[in-house]
């Protein structure tokens, strides 16, 4: 039987995600971001609610990406997620993309030319951001042309690199409906960005997600719920460079801006440059928020939920893969758990995110 892996955030789950799951083959394993997502933001609703959404729409197993995989640049995000999915026995990786290319061919190219392609990146001028350099690399070696407003395609190219040299079939699925960043309300399939933007419009959410009731019932948070705590950490930290990926220049820019801004968006605008993208700045601010430092990734894989098929699959691999189904006195990943504690502070009704939580199953949160 085909075992398909999907890397996702489901922030929140919408009809485009439902379509992606419907097109994936065989047993479907989702490696999902936890309570903070790749572009450096708190998830709108918590990871347990999002796992429930996935399971109710065809996923068989949902596992959590550790914090230092979830909140990373595209290449590290992709590599960490693919590594986890490979340990869970996938043979296919399905992903949505704005452009359908022969990604399998691109993966073979990268496995053969990785050294030359990496060397090419080093020759590009420093004023270019890493995403811009990556686009230039693919254009030079494969004739691809993509723009920065097609993030699913750029992530797909990171999946290509992460799967190079592995026995993994790539299944690109054409993204339908609104663009990734679209805030429009008049699209047949609205984006997660639009749902987050218009979350107060109940009718819009109900027409945009098969799990609207779950989304609307759950405590919802945004970056602004955490700005006072972030500001406190910035103002009281003896040295911001102690935190993950905060260099001297970023520390200086953040410290200089923090007293004159009133929101996270204003802080991001003040700190970002052509070299430091807004997404990178948001990730750095997330690291400061949760006091993240460089640490090894956990050996165990945290299971958020499963169907009967997913449970049967877990039984076939549990002897070779350390699976974490309940976090108690012994931590799974201290940094992820600290991030969960911070996340809980964003809403007074936010349920416990770690201690005593067990994998959910379809229908368990009705």
Swiss-Prot record:
Location in or out of the cell: Cytoplasm
Positions of ATP binding: 7-20, 96, 152, 175
A biological process term (GO) from this entry: tRNA modification
Catalytic activity: cytidine(34) in elongator tRNA(Met) + acetate + ATP = N(4)-acetylcytidine(34) in elongator tRNA(Met) + AMP + diphosphate
TM helices/strands, residue ranges: none
Keyword entries, A-Z: ATP-binding, Cytoplasm, Ligase, Nucleotide-binding, RNA-binding, tRNA processing, tRNA-binding
Pfam families associated with the record: HIGH_NTase1
EC number in record: 6.3.4.-
GO CC terms: cytoplasm
Family: Belongs to the TmcAL family.
PANTHER family noted in UniProt: TRNA(MET) CYTIDINE ACETATE LIGASE
Stored NCBIfam families: PRK13670.1 (NF010191)
Protein name (database record): tRNA(Met) cytidine acetate ligase
Gene symbol of the encoding locus: tmcAL
